[in-house]
Amino acid sequence: MAKIKPQALLQQSKKKKGPSRISITNIVIYTLAVLLLVFVLFSAYRRWTHRSEIPTHNGRSVLEDAAFPGMKNVDLPRFATLDTGKGSVTIELFKDTAPNVVDQFMKFCQDGYFKGFLFSRVVKHFVIQAGDSAEFDAVKDWALDRKNIDTSLKHEEFMVGTPKAKNEQGGFEFFIVSAQIKDLNEKLTVFGRVSKGQDVVQEIEEVETDDQYQPKSPIEIMSVTLLQDM
């Protein structure tokens, strides 16, 4: 057996005891991996906290289309429940007949736009207006012409619509019409009807108003919840 020289033994000993070097490339890779892991965990946390803020009904999310990209029509909300100071009013949304307006309405719901909204004008046994606009000729016309309404026309009651004229402020207002109004479709784009809470609408109509049909005591929409079914 050949003898190993002392000098060779010393070199082998140094190789065994010396610390291994970590290349800069490895350091960069490890750092990127850690940052990626932190980003994934943070994104998951943000998504979880966001979902926890979404209202639910019967264990399902009820996010209030354009607001819902990628969802099938069968999965989209079909009802909106207004929680008001007088009680709850549920509106069936006419997605098939007024898709653009319904999409806009749902987007405003999702953004919380209607929270704190006031019923700004009320005409007893006729119409209530949610939102404020300087242009309310339709309300004045209907109020002044109540006695001349042609009740033989079969317009459904408790329809919900928004003015056809563009809102210059970029907002959204809507009317709940509790009477048969002959020029309803000329004034408004109808996008729904009250399917539950007609008594609440009638109670709102009973409030005392001034000569501009504005309620003397504010009636507020506290929240709007969108549902797939009732």
Swiss-Prot record:
Induction of expression: Repressed by the munition hexahydro-1,3,5-trinitro-1,3,5-triazine, also known as Royal Demolition eXplosive (RDX).
Statement: the UniProt record of this protein carries the keyword Mitochondrion: yes
Activity-regulation annotation: Binds cyclosporin A (CsA). CsA mediates some of its effects via an inhibitory action on PPIase.
Enzyme class: isomerase
Keywords: Chaperone, Isomerase, Mitochondrion, Rotamase, Transit peptide
Reactions catalysed according to its record: [protein]-peptidylproline (omega=180) = [protein]-peptidylproline (omega=0)
Gene Ontology molecular function: peptidyl-prolyl cis-trans isomerase activity
InterPro entries: Cyclophilin-like_dom_sf, Cyclophilin-type_PPIase_dom
Record-linked Gene3D superfamilies: Cyclophilin-like
Entry's EC annotation: 5.2.1.8
Keyword Isomerase part of the UniProt annotation: yes
Transmembrane segments: none
UniProt domain PPIase cyclophilin-type: residue ranges: 76-226
PANTHER family for this protein: PEPTIDYL-PROLYL CIS-TRANS ISOMERASE CYP21-3, MITOCHONDRIAL, PEPTIDYL-PROLYL CIS-TRANS ISOMERASE CYP21-4
Protein known as: Peptidyl-prolyl cis-trans isomerase CYP21-3, mitochondrial
Organism (species): Arabidopsis thaliana (Mouse-ear cress)
